[in-house]
Amino acid sequence: MLNGTTLEAAMLFHGISGGHIQGIMEEMERRSKTEARLAKGTQLNGRDAGMPPLSPEKPALCAGCGGKISDRYYLLAVDKQWHLRCLKCCECKLALESELTCFAKDGSIYCKEDYYRRFSVQRCARCHLGISASEMVMRARDSVYHLSCFTCSTCNKTLTTGDHFGMKDSLVYCRAHFETLLQGEYPPQLSYTELAAKSGGLALPYFNGTGTVQKGRPRKRKSPALGVDIVNYNSGCNENEADHLDRDQQPYPPSQKTKRMRTSFKHHQLRTMKSYFAINHNPDAKDLKQLAQKTGLTKRVLQVWFQNARAKFRRNLLRQENGGVDKADGTSLPAPPSADSGALTPPGTATTLTDLTNPTVTVVTTVTSNMDSHESGSPSQTTLTNLF
């Protein structure tokens, strides 16, 4: 006996044989099942993938409280399921259900702030605490500091962008205390290059001022020897002493009283410079270049030396014009040779720098009131070297 559906189909298709009716009914049933499966799949795809519904066959366990999750939605973090209320920071107990990120370490859950505070890679070189990724910092060489920790180790003065500072053993010093530290460790007469070499290459980024202006040492004068009495233009120094040279840069600012750096000359350097000064008081750039090659000194050092020599020469001329008596020892100084008293070298002889190192040099002697020149190869006679 046919059921109700079959009877209804038979009445609708009364003109069709029974075999055809049975095939049509099976096809309709197959299509209805297919449509039901498609509708179920569409409903599943429309749900939130981040918070999937629980399967009624196997309920999940919460990784926080350990209980079953019967809620429609749950959280998935660190490959584990969590109740919405159970996912929180283990330090500050902040609920992380609405946070964009969370961090896990050794099975514990942390918020962003607590994770960086405890496990941050960057640490302040002063307080050794962690530095978060969103925090403003100060960098010096390879060290990183909090803004509040970037202070002078001596006076705790806060250093900001643009301030001058120095570093020693990872400690930060303000400009004044860093200079005091260097003055206490190294003698003040050391040059900047020597000081930088001994201090392990400490860089002083603020040394950009000009040199200090200080008076030189009291001048010493040599008594006349071997019957020669001539104005000594360089009476303040001899071959064994060091001349003072003003430098463009000093290791300390002009506000502090420090000794001027000194440059020492060797015997052959002084002989060459003094011999040329007797010929030309103001060498030009070409002569300075030749002198630099001859002596191994820089053009700047040579310029300063000739400048100092000209100043000393003028002082001696003024002293002689004012009375011709040296106040230091009371010696009478003769007048310098005038322009018409004769040249130091024969008129036909051109003096070059190569002549300055020749053992046969021009000798200046005093005969009555005239200045004569003659050639001498004897080392016992007075040469230009002996005059200074």
Swiss-Prot record:
Keywords: DNA-binding, Homeobox, LIM domain, Metal-binding, Nucleus, Repeat, Zinc. SMART domains: HOX, LIM. It comes from the Eukaryota. The keyword DNA-binding applies. GO terms for molecular function: DNA-binding transcription factor activity, RNA polymerase II-specific; metal ion binding; RNA polymerase II transcription regulatory region sequence-specific DNA binding; sequence-specific double-stranded DNA binding. Transmembrane segments: none annotated. Residues 376-388 have a biased composition (Polar residues). Residues 344-356 have a biased composition (Low complexity). One of its GO terms (biological process) is gonad morphogenesis. GO terms for cellular component: nucleus. Residues 69-130, 131-193 form the LIM zinc-binding domain. This is LIM/homeobox protein Lhx9. The gene is Lhx9.
